[in-house]
Amino acid sequence: MEHHQPEDPAPGKAGTVEADIPKNHEVLAGPYEHPQDTDARDADGEAGEREPADQALLPSQCGDNLESPLPEAGSAPPGPTLGTLPEVETIKACSMPQELPQSPRTRQPEPDFYCVKWIPWKGERTPIITQSTNGPCPLLAIMNILFLQWKVKLPPQKEVITSDELMAHLGNCLLSIKPQEKSEGLQLNFQQNVDDAMTVLPKLATGLDVNARFTGVSDFEYTPECSVFDLLGIPLYHGWLVDPQSPEAVRAVGKLSYNQLVERIITCKHSSDTNLVTKGLVAEQFLETTAAQLTYHGLCELTAAAKEGELSVFFRNNHFSTMTKHKSHLYLLVTDQGFLQEEQIVWESLHNVDGDSCFCDSDFHLSHSLGKGPGAEGGSGSPEKQLQVDQDYLIALSLQQQQPRGTLGLTDLELAQQLQQEEYQQQQAAQPVWMRTRALSPQGRGATSGRPAGERRQRPKHESDCILL
């Protein structure tokens, strides 16, 4: 509501009004009047009876509103009354007390800010949005794909962005999409999808309602939320599939979605039919054993379904991540705000259902440590060394995928990591070996650094023999 300052009264009448009306309430608010201003209004009414000429100083409708019933003490300020039309129109012309404008300002939520991380992506400096603990992961996952596709660009010095700005960029992208088919039916369907997507946009900042099916990595129950991904051409994947080598689980789960399966479990467990009870227990066991919402069969199907270089959204554990496929391996974009200053940490490998992963830079080169710049490990970050490490890592991943499903999963990868660690220890062993050589001399007899533990246990006996001699 706009606040209008009243016109200055005539010089001959100002003294009478100032004596009866408080300074903070020179113009009454009518039905919107604050309960604390009741006394001021009564005083003004008495002044109006004593000085009829003073009523010309106030709008005529505001004077009529003096007859409206007073609000009860302690009640909230009343809303617009269901009176006559002129009374509603004159409320806009009346200014409210100075205390009331604070209430809309206190109810207004503070904007959400997100830090922007700039990375080198395919030769161009590209922004990605990081998130805090409970950030809007659906919105960020979609927007990061649009940034990596260069469909949305930010100013070069942009360091912080709000959720409203992200929503505005996303809305512009949706409105700029044109239907590929010109038939009337398809255009109407396209317009309906656009309307559904624009309606769903506010939910992207809090979370989307998606219902995965256990039959395929791209199988979801269709909801209006899915229209956003369809319009933008962004694939939506998950890896929560039933292993076809478990026929009991396949029969128990069938082609149901997650919500339907939960309802079936509840129904079967309370059934008097033993077969239904057994089916419900098998389905419940499947949900418990796959609580990570990613199975080995799902990971294999996901790797096969994703296209090389494709940017997609991966759904797991109610979280949406930006995913890509590089050289037949899957990677998730690292958007944790804790890695904002880690330039060498951009992607995280997705090769295991247990969460054991490795960090990579924007070129998918393996990152060895956190918080260390180039050359911090004594030359181990040279291009030749980095290339060898990357090749070893890719070979280990390939061997892992060729393993039988009954094995321990990461045996070859762990072996490669162990060999890599031994190689690092050999590079750093030059100084300790020199110290051990020096310790054998008379000047360094008391030094024990670098000796094995068993050698230290046997040393006191040898020294005691020398002392006795």
Swiss-Prot record:
The keyword Cell division does not apply. Residues 388-426 are annotated as: Ubiquitin-binding domain (UBD). This is Ubiquitin carboxyl-terminal hydrolase MINDY-1. GO terms for cellular component: cell periphery; cytosol. Hydrolase that can specifically remove 'Lys-48'-linked conjugated ubiquitin from proteins. Has exodeubiquitinase activity and has a preference for long polyubiquitin chains. May play a regulatory role at the level of protein turnover. GO terms for molecular function: cysteine-type carboxypeptidase activity; cysteine-type deubiquitinase activity; K48-linked deubiquitinase activity; K48-linked polyubiquitin modification-dependent protein binding. The gene is MINDY1. Signal peptide: none annotated. The modification Phosphoserine is found at S103, S441. Residues 1-85, 428-469 are annotated as: Disordered. Belongs to the MINDY deubiquitinase family. FAM63 subfamily. GO terms for biological process: protein K48-linked deubiquitination; proteolysis. It comes from the Eukaryota. Its EC number is 3.4.19.12. The active site is at C137, H319. The record marks D412, L415, A416, L419 as: Ubiquitin-binding. Keywords: Hydrolase, Phosphoprotein, Protease, Thiol protease, Ubl conjugation pathway. Pfam families: MINDY_DUB. Residues 34-53, 453-469 have a biased composition (Basic and acidic residues). It catalyses: Thiol-dependent hydrolysis of ester, thioester, amide, peptide and isopeptide bonds formed by the C-terminal Gly of ubiquitin (a 76-residue protein attached to proteins as an intracellular targeting signal).
